[in-house]
């Protein structure tokens, strides 16, 4: 079992890690472990994470409660099925000089580039896909779970905003075809960051107090501690 932080953005950050482990099993006492991986997943994220790992047949999801501490559920499943738990990100990341995202990989002995080299989306498109307009456009995500932020974007291009009424993966074609993408720290930001060959210009707004690793492919609008 791979037990990571369960936010949707964390699933995007750790997708490369989980794919790598599923293809290169760890060993304990000369025996492969984590050859088939169970991953706890919050109920509200089941649809998105199921799609994310649809092509990886070694991954199965354990749905856990959204509204309470899920560790007892995870530990009970581990004990009942006699499977070990690989815990990622529950210790040590607060005081490291790297971004906490990179620490997740270091905790299991992996280089951070694996986040990108092993990030994969399914070959088949999701059930719902929003078609891009014919004209050039800017894609904007200015929301988090608690509020919406006003971003000062001066452009004559058409502006398209992420809306919570649509699944996150329904925006894949819009992400790939955008001229610019503007994000606050969110699951959308971590999804966009995981792509390697986007043509869009990327803009990050450090409005939220939560720090995150911002790579050099983003232009940061405002003050932010950047990890390179």
Model regions: which residues?
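Catalytic machinery of carbohydrate-active enzymes
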Residues: 1-228
């Amino acid at each position: 079992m791979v037990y990571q932080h369960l936010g949707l953005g964390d699933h995007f950050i750790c997708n490369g890690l989980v794919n790598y482990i599923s293809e290169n099993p760890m060993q304990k006492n000369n025996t492969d472990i984590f050859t088939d991986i169970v991953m706890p997943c919050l109920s509200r994220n089941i649809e998105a994470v199921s799609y994310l790992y649809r092509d990886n047949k070694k991954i199965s999801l354990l749905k856990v409660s959204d509204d309470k501490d899920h560790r007892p559920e995870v530990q009970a499943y581990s004990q009942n099925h006699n499977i070990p738990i690989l815990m990622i990100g529950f210790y040590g990341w607060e005081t490291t000089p790297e971004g906490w995202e990179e620490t997740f990989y270091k905790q299991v002995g992996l280089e951070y580039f694996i986040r990108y080299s092993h990030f994969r989306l399914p070959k088949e498109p999701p059930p719902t896909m929003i078609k891009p307009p014919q004209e050039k456009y800017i894609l904007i995500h200015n929301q988090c779970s608690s509020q919406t932020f006003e971003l000062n974007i001066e452009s004559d291009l058409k502006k398209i905003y992420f809306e919570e009424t649509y699944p996150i993966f329904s925006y894949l074609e819009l992400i790939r075809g955008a001229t610019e993408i503007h994000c606050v720290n969110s699951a959308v930001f971590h999804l966009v960051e995981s792509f390697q060959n986007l043509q869009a210009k990327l803009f990050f707004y450090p409005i939220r107090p939560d720090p995150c690793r911002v790579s050099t492919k983003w232009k940061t609008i405002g003050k932010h501690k950047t990890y390179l």
